[in-house]
């Protein structure tokens, strides 16, 4: 009984709080015709009896009567009454109403007193009136029934939610248990699947390399420029293997030129050397210990061997002519060969290529004069593995004297043409402020043109990771966003160091040391090569690291690749930047056209190559930078030009030189810019 008595009191307290909120929302005086709840009046009526019908009639004072009573002009009818009308044999009725409901004048009088005595209690008095009227007119039992119903509904809802959640949890637990059982059954087969996956991956790589370097079926078997196919690229090669290949070629009976043709070529070369005025230069002493690389065994007759020995004796005279005049901080490109080139696949052509290779300072052309038959031959010298592509057989030659590291002269460098040599004006003198052409894409990216093409197509790689190459017909279409072609590459690229050259897209495959040549006309991987000595960060770059690990470049002499490698001549094993000229056909790297610079990795922002000279910008994320370092591949020397370079939007992720237009293409924080260059004439 005590608990039953306490419960209504608790409910009454909660009810008072609810009424207090209602008061705050509905402030104002309560008139007799107002209702706190829509179905309850302010008059309370009680009835007793079995057959009883009651009716309460309330006649309160009106507002006019209050004003008349206040002014002293009260009438006889100015009063309020509460009448009770009942019907029935045994019926007792009673009607009660609060005085504030019957006599509104009291409220007004009280309000005036409050305004005069305590204006701050005005709101409190209105709240008291509301509570008084609510207590008289409200059926507490009815409200209690409503509250009980709401509480029961809430309990039912909670029970249903608990039941549903428990059922779902049971289903999830059963699913997890079922999956774990399946995982246990497949655990024993995971190792086998991983090994099969690795074998399939290596097999796919070998097939791609074999397809990229396959010999055309239409090539003649007895062609002197045909080469042995070997795309595995390993270091443990048997030397007898190369000897057997060379011997098999010699057994087929290669056509040997007569001695008269050799003498004519020799006479032509001597006349060209005599026609030039040699500059007095000091010849550096060759290194005492130089490692020789055996490219293969070749069998010659006595006449041809004597001609080659004579060509070696004349090589220093040709090397002396390679020094240029000038007072700039770097030497210019070496002189060009003035002798007329003979026809390919002839005896004169073989000897001229030999003379050019023994000269040591010639820059090979980007186009080849040999037949289309090509192969890659991998040799090992110490701990460095290099891949070379030869069109003819050759003999062992010492390293060139122009580089500080022991290297070999070119086996068959292509003689640069007259127009190619004249296109290099000299060393870099100044870089103009950039010119903005468009705002396109993300913060990182690269845009470029094919310097060997006749049209003005623009190629764009948006971001530093992806597999799409977008082509635009010209600059105007690029500004309008009207692309003409979209290339979906079979392997993703990474970085911004890609180039388009001679109708192919050269890029670094993501997270590997592989470089790929993708033919844009036929849409397939034309070549695939591995850079064995590159120091590559194979972790996923979640943000731009400020550089590309493997960077391609194109200048007047051809295609280049720039990458970091360990300096084996330094005891600290620092990582330095390596510069190497590639063969565009098969991406082979030649030891004689590879230079190790003194530039440390991560010590610069961007780099570009002009006329065989590597230039680096010291920063990529500062507004004002400098071309702080330069390396000349012709002399093997470096310098610090300190030329101003402006990063207009302070986030340059690509700088590449276009030898056709002689400008730099740059991608700066989503803006496409070009820089005009000035040279020392």
From Swiss-Prot:
Biased composition (Basic and acidic residues): 305-315, 333-353
Chief location: secreted
Record site: Cleavage: 300-301
Keyword terms of this UniProt record: Coiled coil, Disulfide bond, Glycoprotein, Secreted, Signal
Keyword Ribonucleoprotein: no
Olfactomedin-like domain mapped to chain residues: 423-681
Gene Ontology MF annotations: extracellular matrix binding; identical protein binding
UniProt region (Disordered), positions on chain: 216-243, 305-441
One cellular component term from this protein's GO annotations in UniProt: extracellular matrix
PTM description: Seems to be cleaved at Lys-301 after secretion. O-glycosylated but not N-glycosylated.
Signal peptide coordinates: 1-32
Regions of compositional bias (Low complexity) in chain numbering: 216-226, 367-400
BP GO annotations: extracellular matrix organization
Regions of compositional bias (Pro residues) in chain numbering: 401-413
Disulfide bonds: 424-611
Cited Pfam families: OLF
Tissue expression pattern: Expressed in lung, eye, testis, uterus, ovary, and to a lesser extent in heart, skeletal muscle, mammary gland, skin and prostate. Within the eye, mainly present in photoreceptor layers (at protein level).
Compartments where located: Secreted
InterPro entries assigned to the protein according to its UniProt record, in alphabetical order: Olfac-like_dom, Olfactomedin-like_domain
PANTHER family the record matches: OLFACTOMEDIN-LIKE PROTEIN 2A (PTHR23192:SF29), OLFACTOMEDIN-RELATED (PTHR23192)
Protein name: Olfactomedin-like protein 2A
Organism of origin: Mus musculus
């Amino acid at each position: 009984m005590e608990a039953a008595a306490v419960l209504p009191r608790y409910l009454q307290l909660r009810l008072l709080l609810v009424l207090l909120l209602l008061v705050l929302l509905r402030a104002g005086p309560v008139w007799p015709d107002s209702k706190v709840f829509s179905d309850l009046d302010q008059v309370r009526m009680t009835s007793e009896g079995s057959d009883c019908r009651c009716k309460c009639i309330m006649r309160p004072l009106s507002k006019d009567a209050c004003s008349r009573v206040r002014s002293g002009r009260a009438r006889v009818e100015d009063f309020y009454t509460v009448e009770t009308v009942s019907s029935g044999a045994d019926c007792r009725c009673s009607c009660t109403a609060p005085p504030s409901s019957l006599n509104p004048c009291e409220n007004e009088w009280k309000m005036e007193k409050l305004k005069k005595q305590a204006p701050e209690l005005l709101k409190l008095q209105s709240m008291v009136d509301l509570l008084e009227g609510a207590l008289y007119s409200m059926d507490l039992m009815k409200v209690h029934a409503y509250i009980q119903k709401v509480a029961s509904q809430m309990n039912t809802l909670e029970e249903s939610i608990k039941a549903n959640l428990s059922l779902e949890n049971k289903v999830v637990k059963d699913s997890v248990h079922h999956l774990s059982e399946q995982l246990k059954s497949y655990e024993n087969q995971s190792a086998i699947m991983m090994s099969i996956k690795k074998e399939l991956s290596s097999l796919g790589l070998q097939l791609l390399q074999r397809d990229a370097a396959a010999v055309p079926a239409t090539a003649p078997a007895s062609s002197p420029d045909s080469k042995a196919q070997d795309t595995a690229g390993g270091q443990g090669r048997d030397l007898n293997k190369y000897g057997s290949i060379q011997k098999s070629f010699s057994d087929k009976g290669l056509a040997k030129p007569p001695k008269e043709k050799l003498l004519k070529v020799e006479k032509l070369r001597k006349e060209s050397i005599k026609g030039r005025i040699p500059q007095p230069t000091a010849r550096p002493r060759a290194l005492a210990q130089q490692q020789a690389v055996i490219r293969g065994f070749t069998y010659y007759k006595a006449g041809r061997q004597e001609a080659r020995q004579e060509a070696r004796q004349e090589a220093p005279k040709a090397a002396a002519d390679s020094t240029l005049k000038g007072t700039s901080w770097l030497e210019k490109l070496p002189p060009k060969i003035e002798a007329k080139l003979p026809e390919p696949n002839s005896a004169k052509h073989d000897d001229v290529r030999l003379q050019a290779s023994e000269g040591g300072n010639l820059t090979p052309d980007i186009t080849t004069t040999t037949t289309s038959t090509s192969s890659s031959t991998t040799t090992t010298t110490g701990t460095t593995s290099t891949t070379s592509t030869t069109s003819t057989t050759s003999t062992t030659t010492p390293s060139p004297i122009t580089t500080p590291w022991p290297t070999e002269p070119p086996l068959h460098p292509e003689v640069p043409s007259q127009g190619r040599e004249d296109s290099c004006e000299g060393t870099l003198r100044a870089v103009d402020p950039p010119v903005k052409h468009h705002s396109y894409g993300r913060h990182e990216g690269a845009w470029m043109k094919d310097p060997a093409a006749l049209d003005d197509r623009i190629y764009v790689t948006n971001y530093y990771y992806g597999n799409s190459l977008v082509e635009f017909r010209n600059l105007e279409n690029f500004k309008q966003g009207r692309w003409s072609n979209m290339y979906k590459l079979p392997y993703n690229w990474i970085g911004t160091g890609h180039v388009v050259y001679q109708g192919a897209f050269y890029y670094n495959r993501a997270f590997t040391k592989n470089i790929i040549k993708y033919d844009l006309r036929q849409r397939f991987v034309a070549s695939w090569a591995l850079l064995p000595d590159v120091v590559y960060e194979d972790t996923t770059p979640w943000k731009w690291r400020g550089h590309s690990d493997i960077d391609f470049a194109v200048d007047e002499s051809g295609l280049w690749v720039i990458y970091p490698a360990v300096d084996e001549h330094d005891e600290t094993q620092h990582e330095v930047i390596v510069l190497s000229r590639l063969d565009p056909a098969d991406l082979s790297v030649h030891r004689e056209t590879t230079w190790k610079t003194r530039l440390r990795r991560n010590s610069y922002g961007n780099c570009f190559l002009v006329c065989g000279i590597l230039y680096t910008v010291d920063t990529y994320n500062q507004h004002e930078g400098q071309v702080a370092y330069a390396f000349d591949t012709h002399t093997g020397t470096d310098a610090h030009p300190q030329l101003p370079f402006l990063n207009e939007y302070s986030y340059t992720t690509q700088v590449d030189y276009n030898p056709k237009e002689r400008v730099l293409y740059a991608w700066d924080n989503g803006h496409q810019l070009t820089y005009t260059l000035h040279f020392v004439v």
